[in-house]
Amino acid sequence: MQAKQRFTNVTLVTPIGEKNQDLLVKDNLIVDIVDRDSSVSDDFHIYDGEDNYIFPGMIDVLQHGFLNYLYGHAEENCTVDNAKLLPEVGVTGFLPSTPCLPPEQTRELLNNLSNDIDKSKEGSRILGIHSEGPCFALPGAHNPKNLRNPSVELAEELIDATNGKLKAVTIAPEMEGAEACIKRLKKDNISIHLGHSGANPEDVPMFADWGVDAATHMYDALPTYPADDTGVHVLSLTDALIAESRIALGLICDGIHVHPQLVELLSHLPSDRVFLETDSVKGSGSPVPVKFEFYPGRWCTVEKGKASTYDGLLAGSSLTSIEGLQNYLKYSKKSISQVSIAASLVPARVIGLDDKMGSIEKNKFADFILLRKNDLEIAETFIAGKSVYKSD
């Protein structure tokens, strides 16, 4: 690896627009953005970007698995192994996410994932852990037998089991004990995501006051309501989330979980309100169908772009981050710079890391992907200024 690199013949995708300038990287950081005809010291290695985009590395804050692993199965080195493969789909940072398990299994899984973070030295950055549950009002595909009530004690149990590496928790905030649980988690700067919830829509501003700052998989496991018998459209939970500017909205942009026209509707919000997440499970990214046991007796299949239980219930997704980017660009009709905010910058901000990553800006990590302009496929992925994946 060259200690100093100058990426030229590229278009930089930044939060404020595209820039036909050169990117200077020293060691693991972006140190400057300069005009193409500007002179810099001779010790910068010239890298020809072949007229590709330089797009910020994508950050997936909800990921239950990828290819051969489901993180809930607690297989040794599962996240370490996947970290080496995720650059192929444009992911430079992610939160392995946990399902609803019995208490002892939850503690063991969280501890194992925490240890994996310490061991991981190659590939995508494992940025922390996302506990999706166990405090749900609506279980979705999760095991309803493993749901628990929120409490301060549970919050501390999750924090302790992850050795301080807990970055996000999805919770139904209408449950008894949720306020105290949320406020305890916020003391450790943990992002609180409303999800699997049937909360009163009028309570959403109060939840934001408590510390809820995001919504998990918008429109999914969040009930909407039709017009009432008099023809009045009542306020739904998703309406209230859209209206609450303090809450960022997580979106599984596979064209299955959320109708493309609803994606376009969300895209009219300010760009910093929406972020892309995959909710991917084992088998995502696989070219062949994959079957697995989500929990004892609950079998799932991943095929034809969809992850579902044998009885047809959606069970996460088979989406990859690069597919989500491509879909969001198509459905939202936003510019590629605006899409980069949803794919990279807002996820980083949600988990408190936007000062270090999430955009092509000076003094941030040199984590980015070279995207071909003609088809938006990945040509190469760089993490800390080092090439970690290159397409054939």
Protein language model regions, located:
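N-terminal metal-binding scaffold of metallo-dependent hydrolase/deaminase domains
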Residues: 1-40, 375, 382
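Divalent-metal coordination cores built from histidine and acidic residues
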Residues: 83-165
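Active-site core of metal-dependent hydrolases
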Residues: 156, 160-287
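Conserved, mostly hydrophobic/aromatic
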Residues: 62, 131, 185, 215, ...
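His/Asp/Glu-enriched, well-ordered alpha-helical/loop segment
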Residues: 233-249, 267-278, 284-364, 368-371
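Active-site gating loops and adjacent loop-to-helix segments of metal-dependent hydrolytic enzymes
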Residues: 64, 85-95, 139-162, 206-248, ...
